[in-house]
Amino acid sequence: MLKQRFVLDTTALTDLQTREVMGYTSLCEGMKAILDLIADARLQFGISCYVPYPSVYKEMYEFASRNGCDREVTAKIDTWLVKKAPDRYRVDVTSQIFHEYVSYMRERINRGMGVAEDAIWEAATECLFMENPQNKKKEYREEVEREVIGGIIGKFRNKYRAALRYGILDSAPDIDVLILAKELDAAVVASDYGIEKWAEQLGVRFVPANTFPMMIKEYLKHSPEGEKEKGEADKKKKSHSEEAEFI
C-alpha cells in the first residue's frame, strides 16, 4: 500500500465545522481528538502528517496556548506531527502561476479600494445631513464618530476583508503549506479557500479539514484492530438477533 502523506495547515486542527462534525464544543478537546486519530494512523498505517516549520508549527502552538489548551495538546503536536521546513529554493513553480497570482492580487486590491471609497462617500454624505449647532461642536463630533463613523468603519472592515482576503494566499504559512506539499507530493489539509484554490493551480491534492478526520477513521476501520472490532460487533449483533427470534 502506498503510504499517504499530508501537510496540515493550522485550520486542519482548529476548524469549527470539523469540531461540530466530530461532536466537540471545546477547541482543545477537538484538537486532541484529531491528533489522536493522526497518532493511530501513524502507528497502524505509517501515515505521515507534516507541518511546515517554523511558520505553521509556531501558529498552531500559539493558537493552542492562547486558547488555554493544556500541555497535552502541545505535546501531541510535537509528537505526532512531523516538523519540516519547506525547501523554498528547490521546489519549482512555473512563472505562469506567479503571473496569474500577481494579476489576481491586483484585481483584489482594486476591488478593496472600491469598497474603501464607497465607505468614505457614505460617511461624508451622512455627516452632511446631520445638524451641526456651532456651539456644540465637540458634542457633534463625538456623535458623528459614535453614530456614523463607527458603524460604517465596522461594515467597511468586513467588506474589505471579504473583497481582498477571501480566496487569496495572505500569509507566509499558507505559502509554506503549499510548497511543502509540492515538495513531498503530499495532500494539503486545510479549511481555507485561498489554499484550496492555489493547491489546484499547483496540482497539489487538497483535503477539506472537515472531511480529514472521517478519512482517517475510514483507514483505521480496515486496520487489523478495526477488522477485529468489526467482527466482534457483527457477532454480538447476530447473537442479539438470534435471541430475539427465539423469544
Swiss-Prot record:
InterPro entries: RNA_free_RNase_P (IPR014856). GO terms for biological process: tRNA 5'-leader removal. Residues 223-247 are annotated as: Disordered. It comes from the Archaea. GO terms for molecular function: ribonuclease P activity. It holds the Pfam family PIN_5. The keyword Cell inner membrane does not apply. CDD domains: PIN_VapC-like. Keywords: Endonuclease, Hydrolase, Nuclease, tRNA processing. It is an enzyme of class 3 (hydrolase). It catalyses: Endonucleolytic cleavage of RNA, removing 5'-extranucleotides from tRNA precursor. The keyword tRNA processing applies. Its EC number is 3.1.26.5. RNA-free RNase P that catalyzes the removal of the 5'-leader sequence from pre-tRNA to produce the mature 5'-terminus. Belongs to the HARP family. This is RNA-free ribonuclease P. It comes from Methanosarcina acetivorans (strain ATCC 35395 / DSM 2834 / JCM 12185 / C2A).
